[in-house]
């Protein structure tokens, strides 16, 4: 994940689990791994498909499909092996089907496929990222290309938080009308198009489609639109359980293009054929009243997503920093909402103030949004990384010193809240990239404890995690001056864990006491981690003994350390981790089956001697390893032997990080041919425990000059 800087030119060009039924000729995981791979260095142009690999660097990229021909000719064995979600959809409370008022976010930003198209990350000073996942149910990646396939970085981030990720199928203008006349001509045609949409969603690991037909339809086409939607919806449900198909308010039952800004008799046929209806943005309170009393909507209010354009284009209610006014009205009528283009906080403001503006925007909406609880078994781990930063950290040390952006790296996000108390007291949590424990950011907890108040408490996680009989807790932070910091955990008993999540349940607070550093569990944990503290970071460990309980909230309590005057504080939180205390040494598997393919050799700029060109290696590494056991993989390389036998073997050097069992080595400078290098894959466990080198994966690559002796061309 060591990123390269890319221009935001808006060009489109499709991250990565490998489907079980993938029979692509690129796959070599089922073949015996050679002890060494040999390559002949030839500087020929790359033959990799430019829609999936950057033509200049061969970096893997995400892309859309621009035409009906591209859709109908799509084949699984020609699809990108990188643009595939590697994170399964997490459970959460309340489940989507139980949530009476849902929130969809439609991400429409400057045409789409910007820095986020680089699947292994990009070097970006001030990127846009979404991290208020606790508030939303569905994430839609939107562009004006015909078939918008969500970049896997977004799907992974959404899935990690239990949020659905859906793509967009859109037709517009004259060309769109021609497309519709073709694929809606008859049953065979619309089924062929729907089948491809289902296959693409299944292959890439996302969860459905927004269907947006913004052109007029002939009588034949509109009569086939309902059956098309119904067939697509049924097939999606069968192939991708939990998926959704949502219709955008556009054409009417007679084929005319006339936005209604509500669900009514003119567009009901489309609503009846799929999972939801996304209204246009120019609605009024009268529109909401009408939908609330509309017979066809009864029992399906949650499936009506009232559109809100954050840019406030046209005659709309709310928008911008008054979007909360629109949500207040929508929730008054018990309807769901679709928030369109919340990247307004990024596009229309100073990029350096992005975090502050995004937190302000979602804070204003928070009274009208559910907080969803991601649900998982132990271990639960978060370092608060938002998927970007000024440097890349590992255990408080800078691993890569440059700006980067990669949503694959985003971890479970905390609640970003702001509260005020009497006498001027306040409390806020925010992400901060100035320092981090792991990843690119830490959680800043800051505020003022006013005179007369002994402490303040910040809720940083709402979740649902069944605890072990003995649960080990690790808490990494930088101790602040003048105040004391402690953990408060809220739990519920096991019998209460079967509810559907829509009602509040009384919890009890647990205030664990820190274990001594001499405690056997603490010593074992420290030994597994390989490093105890760094650059002012402190680690506190706790042991919970609770049978049949689940964790519901993680809170941090800040109390004054003597005195009664107003006291300002700021505390940096690096990581919170909960583990089964009886499995602190769970054995990890070895990386197996490393293979190297799709090798491309390039020449770089002249070296310092003025006449020798740099030799650059580009190659895809694939291996076998259960990715659910790891936080990420570190990819290393070292020089073993070159043309000059007097030069000894080199040390291992980090190339980057991978978040799946797949990595593209890009522009790696290696010694001139003939040479021998070693490529190494190091698994990093979710807990951050050190993995013995004997379990790392290794593959040697030898290379020689072409027989002509001229490696240039």
From Swiss-Prot:
TM segment ranges: none
Major enzyme class: hydrolase
Record-linked CDD domains: GH85_ENGase
Protein's recorded name: Cytosolic endo-beta-N-acetylglucosaminidase
Keywords tagged on the record: Cytoplasm, Glycosidase, Hydrolase
Any one GO molecular function term: mannosyl-glycoprotein endo-beta-N-acetylglucosaminidase activity
Organism: Danio rerio (Zebrafish)
Pfam families in the cross-refs: Glyco_hydro_85
Catalytic activity of the protein: an N(4)-(oligosaccharide-(1->3)-[oligosaccharide-(1->6)]-beta-D-Man-(1->4)-beta-D-GlcNAc-(1->4)-alpha-D-GlcNAc)-L-asparaginyl-[protein] + H2O = an oligosaccharide-(1->3)-[oligosaccharide-(1->6)]-beta-D-Man-(1->4)-D-GlcNAc + N(4)-(N-acetyl-beta-D-glucosaminyl)-L-asparaginyl-[protein]
Primary residence: cytoplasm
EC number: 3.2.1.96
Function (record text): Endoglycosidase that releases N-glycans from glycoproteins by cleaving the beta-1,4-glycosidic bond in the N,N'-diacetylchitobiose core. Involved in the processing of free oligosaccharides in the cytosol.
InterPro entries xref list: ENGase, Glyco_hydro_85
Encoding gene, per UniProt annotation: engase
Chain intervals for the UniProt region annotation (Disordered): 1-36
Highest taxon, organism lineage: Eukaryota
Family designation: Belongs to the glycosyl hydrolase 85 family.
GO CC terms in record: cytosol
Localization terms from the record: Cytoplasm, Cytosol
Gene Ontology terms describing biological process: N-glycan processing
Residue ranges of domain BRCT in the record: 270-362
């Amino acid at each position: 994940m060591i990123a390269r800087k890319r221009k935001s030119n808006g060009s489109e060009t499709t991250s990565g689990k490998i489907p079980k039924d993938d029979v692509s000729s690129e796959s070599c995981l089922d073949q015996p791994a050679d002890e060494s791979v040999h390559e002949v260095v030839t500087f020929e142009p790359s033959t990799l498909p430019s829609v999936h690999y950057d033509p200049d660097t061969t970096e893997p990229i995400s892309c859309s499909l621009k035409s009906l021909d591209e859709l109908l000719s799509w084949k699984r064995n020609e699809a990108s092996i990188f643009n595939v979600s590697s994170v399964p959809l997490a459970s959460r409370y309340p489940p989507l089907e139980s949530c009476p008022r849902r929130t969809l976010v439609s991400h429409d930003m400057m045409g789409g496929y910007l820095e986020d198209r680089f699947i292994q990350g990009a070097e970006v000073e001030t990127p846009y990222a979404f991290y208020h996942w606790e508030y939303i149910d569905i994430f839609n990646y939107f562009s004006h290309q015909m078939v918008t396939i969500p970049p896997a970085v977004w799907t992974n981030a959404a899935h990690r938080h239990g949020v659905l990720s859906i793509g967009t199928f859109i037709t517009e203008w004259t060309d769109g009308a021609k497309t519709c006349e073709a694929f809606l001509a008859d049953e065979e045609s619309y089924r062929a198009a729907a089948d491809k949409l289902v296959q693409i969603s299944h292959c890439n690991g996302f969860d459905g489609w927004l269907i947006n037909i913004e052109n007029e339809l002939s009588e034949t086409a509109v009569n086939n639109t309902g059956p098309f939607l119904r067939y697509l919806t049924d097939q999606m449900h069968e192939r991708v359980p939990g998926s959704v198909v949502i219709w955008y308010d556009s054409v009417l039952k007679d084929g005319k293009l006339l936005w209604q800004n509500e669900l009514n008799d003119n567009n009901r046929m489309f609503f009846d054929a799929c999972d939801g209806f996304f209204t246009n943005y120019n609605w009024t309170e009268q529109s909401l009243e009408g939908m609330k009393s509309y017979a066809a909507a009864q029992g399906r209010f949650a499936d009506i997503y009232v559109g809100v354009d954050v840019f406030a284009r046209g005659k709309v209610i709310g928008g911008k920093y008054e979007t909360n006014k629109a949500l207040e009205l929508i929730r008054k009528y018990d309807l769901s909402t679709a928030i369109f283009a919340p990247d307004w906080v990024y596009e229309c403001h100073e990029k350096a103030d992005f975090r502050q503006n995004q937190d302000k925007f979602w804070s204003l909406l928070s009274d009208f949004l559910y907080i969803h609880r991601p649900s998982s078994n132990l271990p639960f781990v978060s370092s608060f990384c938002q998927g970007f930063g000024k440097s890349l950290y590992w255990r408080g040390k800078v691993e890569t010193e440059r700006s980067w952006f990669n949503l694959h790296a985003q971890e479970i996000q905390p609640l970003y809240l702001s509260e005020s108390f009497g006498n001027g007291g306040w409390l806020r949590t925010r992400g901060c990239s100035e320092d981090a424990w792991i990843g690119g950011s830490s959680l800043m907890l800051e505020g003022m404890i006013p005179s007369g108040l002994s402490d303040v408490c910040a809720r940083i996680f709402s979740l649902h995690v069944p605890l072990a009989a003995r649960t080990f807790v690790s808490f990494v932070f930088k101790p602040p001056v003048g105040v004391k910091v402690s953990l408060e955990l809220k739990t519920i008993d096991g019998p209460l864990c079967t509810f559907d999540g829509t009602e509040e349940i009384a919890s009890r607070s647990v205030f664990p006491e820190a274990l001594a550093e001499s405690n056997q569990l603490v010593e074992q944990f420290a030994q597994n981690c390989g490093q105890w503290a760094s650059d002012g970071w402190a680690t506190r460990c706790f042991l919970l003994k609770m049978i049949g309980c689940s964790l519901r909230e993680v809170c941090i309590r800040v109390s004054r350390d003597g005195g009664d005057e107003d006291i300002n504080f700021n505390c940096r939180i690096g990581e919170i981790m909960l583990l089964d205390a009886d499995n602190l040494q769970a054995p990890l598997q070895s990386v197996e089956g490393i293979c190297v393919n799709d090798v491309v050799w390039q020449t770089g700029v002249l070296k310092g001697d003025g006449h020798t060109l740099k030799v650059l290696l580009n190659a895809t590494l694939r291996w076998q390893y259960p990715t659910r056991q790891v936080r990420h993989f570190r990819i290393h390389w070292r020089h073993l032997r070159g043309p000059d036998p007097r030069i000894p073997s080199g040390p291992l050097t980090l190339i980057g990080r991978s978040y799946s069992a797949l990595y593209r080595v890009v522009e790696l400078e290696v010694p001139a041919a003939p040479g021998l290098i070693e490529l190494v894959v190091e698994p990093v466990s979710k807990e951050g425990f050190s993995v013995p080198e004997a379990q790392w994966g290794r593959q040697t690559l030898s290379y020689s000059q072409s027989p002509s002796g001229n490696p240039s061309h």
